[in-house]
A protein has these predicted regions:
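Beta-rich accessory regions
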Residues: 1-182
């Protein structure tokens, strides 16, 4: 799949990583509570790209826990396999950040039943103010359905999640992208 959007594809302020492709996916259908859903997962061949790995023993997080030393020599690309046990928490997640203070916030909000990826502080995002808006109806809906909407690029996107005691996230980070797969 293409990792861009026609609204801002021609104004993204980069050349090298402009209009990249996302990881290849395997699509499948599953039934839950009588409804049919589509699932997407990275193709099995993605595992062959892995090199070195590091494992962190399970730990409990109160307010914050920093693991930046684990990612100190990643050369801008890495995968995080993360298992979250909700316990009594209603919101849990992580923040990916760089030395410039730019960050992407990834979290699960159980009250809202949403997995959120917020890229409003992910770097140069102000070009989104010049993006071509959606049709009026869709644009208003996008503003209402987004989280922290700034413009059609700088916003938080989300996917629905069911309440569960544990979640497994597979997060792929590259120099210019973040892709998340849940359970």
């Amino acid at each position: 799949p293409w990792m861009s959007n026609w609204q801002y594809a021609n104004i993204v302020p980069t050349r090298q990583f402009r209009s990249a492709n996302a990881l290849p996916r395997e699509l499948s259908l599953y039934t839950q509570d009588g409804d049919i859903y589509m699932a997407a997962a990275p193709v099995e061949e993605t595992k062959s790209l892995r090199k070195e790995s590091r494992e962190i023993p399970a730990f409990e997080v109160g307010d914050a826990y920093h693991v930046d030393s684990l990612l100190s020599d990643n050369k801008g690309a890495y995968e995080i396999e993360l298992e979250l046990a909700t316990g009594s928490a209603e919101i849990m997640g992580l923040k990916l950040f760089n030395e410039k203070g730019e960050n992407v916030d990834i979290y699960i909000s159980l009250p809202e039943k949403k997995l959120v990826m917020d890229r409003t502080k992910s770097g140069i995002v102000d070009f989104g103010k010049d993006s071509a808006p959606h049709a009026i109806e869709a644009h208003d809906r996008r503003k209402q359905n987004s989280i922290n909407y700034v413009d059609d690029f700088a916003l938080g996107t989300w996917a629905p999640v069911q309440k569960a005691g544990n979640y497994k996230l597979d997060i792929f980070v590259d120099k210019c992208s973040v892709e998340i797969f849940l359970n």
